[in-house]
Amino acid sequence: MARFVVAALLVLLSLSGLEAIQHAPKIQVYSRHPAENGKPNFLNCYVSGFHPSDIEVDLLKNGKKIEKVEHSDLSFSKDWSFYLLYYTEFTPNDKDEYACRVSHMTFPAPKTVKWDRNM
Protein backbone atom coordinates (compact mmCIF):
# COMPACT_ATOMS: atom_id res chain seq x y z
CA MET A 1 0.00 0.00 0.00
CA ALA A 2 2.83 2.40 0.83
CA ARG A 3 4.39 1.81 -2.59
CA PHE A 4 1.09 2.66 -4.28
CA VAL A 5 0.82 5.94 -2.35
CA VAL A 6 4.40 6.88 -3.23
CA ALA A 7 3.83 6.00 -6.90
CA ALA A 8 0.60 8.02 -6.98
CA LEU A 9 2.38 11.03 -5.45
CA LEU A 10 5.17 10.79 -8.01
CA VAL A 11 2.63 10.71 -10.86
CA LEU A 12 0.80 13.75 -9.47
CA LEU A 13 4.06 15.65 -9.02
CA SER A 14 5.15 14.87 -12.57
CA LEU A 15 1.79 16.04 -13.96
CA SER A 16 1.95 19.33 -12.09
CA GLY A 17 5.51 19.74 -13.37
CA LEU A 18 4.22 19.63 -16.97
CA GLU A 19 2.17 22.75 -16.34
CA ALA A 20 5.22 24.58 -15.00
CA ILE A 21 7.24 24.13 -18.21
CA GLN A 22 7.32 27.33 -20.23
CA HIS A 23 8.39 27.67 -23.85
CA ALA A 24 8.52 30.95 -25.73
CA PRO A 25 6.66 31.06 -29.04
CA LYS A 26 8.45 31.11 -32.37
CA ILE A 27 6.85 33.75 -34.61
CA GLN A 28 6.89 33.57 -38.42
CA VAL A 29 5.24 36.26 -40.58
CA TYR A 30 4.85 35.59 -44.29
CA SER A 31 2.47 36.00 -47.23
CA ARG A 32 0.72 33.08 -48.87
CA HIS A 33 2.01 34.05 -52.32
CA PRO A 34 5.04 36.12 -53.38
CA ALA A 35 4.21 39.79 -52.78
CA GLU A 36 3.12 41.88 -55.76
CA ASN A 37 1.98 45.48 -55.24
CA GLY A 38 -1.75 45.88 -55.83
CA LYS A 39 -2.42 42.13 -55.99
CA PRO A 40 -4.59 40.63 -53.17
CA ASN A 41 -2.78 38.13 -50.96
CA PHE A 42 -2.98 36.65 -47.46
CA LEU A 43 -0.82 37.72 -44.52
CA ASN A 44 0.02 34.82 -42.18
CA CYS A 45 1.39 34.78 -38.65
CA TYR A 46 2.37 31.27 -37.56
CA VAL A 47 3.08 31.02 -33.84
CA SER A 48 4.52 27.70 -32.66
CA GLY A 49 6.37 25.85 -29.94
CA PHE A 50 4.80 27.71 -27.00
CA HIS A 51 3.63 26.54 -23.59
CA PRO A 52 1.38 27.26 -21.74
CA SER A 53 -1.43 27.81 -24.22
CA ASP A 54 -2.53 31.30 -23.10
CA ILE A 55 -1.45 33.65 -25.89
CA GLU A 56 -2.61 36.82 -27.62
CA VAL A 57 -1.85 37.37 -31.32
CA ASP A 58 -2.63 40.50 -33.35
CA LEU A 59 -1.92 41.31 -36.98
CA LEU A 60 -0.95 44.95 -37.48
CA LYS A 61 -1.11 47.42 -40.36
CA ASN A 62 1.06 50.48 -39.76
CA GLY A 63 1.11 49.67 -36.04
CA LYS A 64 -2.68 49.43 -35.69
CA LYS A 65 -4.58 46.20 -35.02
CA ILE A 66 -6.33 44.68 -38.04
CA GLU A 67 -9.87 43.77 -36.98
CA LYS A 68 -10.87 41.28 -39.69
CA VAL A 69 -8.52 38.42 -38.80
CA GLU A 70 -9.17 34.69 -38.75
CA HIS A 71 -7.23 31.93 -36.99
CA SER A 72 -6.89 28.18 -36.77
CA ASP A 73 -7.91 26.19 -33.74
CA LEU A 74 -5.30 25.89 -31.01
CA SER A 75 -3.36 22.67 -31.68
CA PHE A 76 -0.46 20.89 -30.05
CA SER A 77 2.62 19.06 -31.31
CA LYS A 78 4.12 15.74 -30.24
CA ASP A 79 6.16 17.57 -27.58
CA TRP A 80 2.92 19.08 -26.13
CA SER A 81 3.82 22.60 -27.25
CA PHE A 82 1.08 24.59 -28.98
CA TYR A 83 0.74 26.27 -32.37
CA LEU A 84 -1.68 28.63 -34.13
CA LEU A 85 -2.05 30.35 -37.48
CA TYR A 86 -3.54 33.86 -37.73
CA TYR A 87 -4.28 35.22 -41.19
CA THR A 88 -6.04 37.99 -43.08
CA GLU A 89 -6.49 39.11 -46.65
CA PHE A 90 -4.38 42.13 -47.61
CA THR A 91 -3.07 43.93 -50.67
CA PRO A 92 0.65 44.74 -50.48
CA ASN A 93 2.02 48.12 -51.51
CA ASP A 94 5.16 50.18 -50.91
CA LYS A 95 3.74 52.45 -48.19
CA ASP A 96 2.06 50.12 -45.65
CA GLU A 97 3.94 48.11 -43.03
CA TYR A 98 2.55 44.82 -41.72
CA ALA A 99 3.51 42.91 -38.59
CA CYS A 100 2.43 40.33 -36.03
CA ARG A 101 2.37 41.16 -32.31
CA VAL A 102 2.41 38.32 -29.77
CA SER A 103 1.86 38.49 -26.01
CA HIS A 104 2.86 35.41 -24.00
CA MET A 105 3.93 34.90 -20.39
CA THR A 106 7.46 34.02 -21.55
CA PHE A 107 7.90 37.54 -22.99
CA PRO A 108 8.47 40.49 -20.62
CA ALA A 109 6.57 42.65 -23.15
CA PRO A 110 4.65 41.92 -26.37
CA LYS A 111 6.94 40.93 -29.24
CA THR A 112 6.37 42.35 -32.72
CA VAL A 113 7.75 40.71 -35.87
CA LYS A 114 7.53 42.66 -39.14
CA TRP A 115 6.54 41.11 -42.44
CA ASP A 116 9.44 41.05 -44.89
CA ARG A 117 8.05 40.99 -48.41
CA ASN A 118 11.27 39.36 -49.67
CA MET A 119 10.96 36.29 -47.47
From Swiss-Prot:
Recorded hits in InterPro entries, A to Z, give: B2Microglobulin, Ig-like_dom, Ig-like_dom_sf, Ig-like_fold, Ig/MHC_CS, Ig_C1-set, MHC/Immunoglobulin
Which Cys-Cys disulphide bridges does the record give?
C45-C100
Could you name the domain of life of the organism this protein comes from? Eukaryota
Principal subcellular localization: secreted
Q: Where is this chain's protein located in or outside the cell?
A: Secreted
Q: By its UniProt entry, which Gene3D superfamilies does this protein fall under?
A: Immunoglobulins (2.60.40.10)
Output the PROSITE patterns linked to this UniProt entry. Answer: IG_LIKE, IG_MHC
The protein in question is named Beta-2-microglobulin
- What is the species of this protein? Pithecia irrorata (Gray monk saki)
